[in-house]
Amino acid sequence: MIVLRFLSLLLISLLCVSVVQADLYKKIDQQGRVFFTDKPEGRGYKLIMRTPKKGTVAYRQFEQNRRKLTPLIRQQAKKHKVDSALVMAVIHAESAYDQRAISRAGAVGLMQLMPKTAERFGVTNRNNPAQNISGGTRYLRHLLELFKFDIRLTLAAYNAGESAVAKYGNKIPPYPETQTYVKRVVKHYQYYLSDNKSL
């Protein structure tokens, strides 16, 4: 949706198991390009987000929120015909299941809805978990249909916008943040599928 949006979240993604667990590093090169990675190579990278480890207070809060919200996520996913594992993966990356998450760009809630997106999909209160998940899931369904159920393009559009994906010929835009976002959410998606947490 908005470049660098996820950096404003206190808890962001990569919280569950080793397959998706990593710290986040940032680098700005001489041309001003921004790069994100969980495996820094070479100089210039700075640690900007450390992943809470199992057993920590942050991890326990994450798990508590996830368990509490899972029935609601399943309900909305079924209603709008979207894989619940995909919805969980997006929520994991967008807000780490923190319904109070707010970005510097103005995105709010579990699925980090911007005002126009919320209005477009009938959300009147972005802070309400049920409304936020409903609106975000409806948006995912719209994007899935728009991009012929290509998961990666759907995620790229969720992050950078539909027009950005269209601008680059229905390919993932060459934005470091968007490319990192897509890879991260796909990892979460694979985790939720394999771990059956979405069933």
Model-derived features with residue positions:
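A short beta-strand micro-motif
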Residues: 25-29
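Positively charged n-region of N-terminal signal peptides that target proteins for export
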Residues: 1-6
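Catalytic glycan-binding domains that act on GlcNAc-containing polysaccharides
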Residues: 40-199
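Sec/Tat signal peptide C-region and signal peptidase I cleavage site
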Residues: 18-22
